Design a protein with these regions (language model features):
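Ribonuclease/tRNase effector modules and their secretory precursors
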Residues: 1-103
Length: 103
């Protein structure tokens, strides 16, 4: 399944729904629309053949979510998605506060 900028494997999203409290890749793709999302290179899981990135951002305007993706054919191919941990939410909101305080 794909949209204009994001892609994923349907079988993988089905297993992700079961494993991560009903979170589909289609829903998780909303994280890329969050202008305040945190994004970093995933040193631990990247290989020479495949770079991976971690994004922490909001979906449905309030739920902080973590998405792992790899760039493929000019799209962001989602590998995994889950709801964020307490520490990940804290990092997201601390960054958001810093951004807002500069305005």
């Amino acid at each position: 399944m794909e949209n204009e900028s994001t892609g994923w494997n349907e079988n993988k999203t089905s297993s992700n729904i079961k494993k991560h409290e009903g979170l589909s890749f289609e829903e998780a793709a909303e994280v890329f629309d969050d202008p305040f999302a945190l994004e970093k290179y995933d040193d631990k899981n990247s290989t020479i053949d495949e770079a991976r990135y971690i994004v922490i951002g909001r979906i449905k305007r309030q739920i902080v979510t973590l998405v792992v993706y790899t760039p493929r054919n000019e799209k962001k191919r989602i590998i995994s998605a889950r709801y964020s941990t307490t520490n990940e939410r804290k990092a997201y909101y601390e960054r958001l506060r810093r951004i807002i305080s500069k305005v």
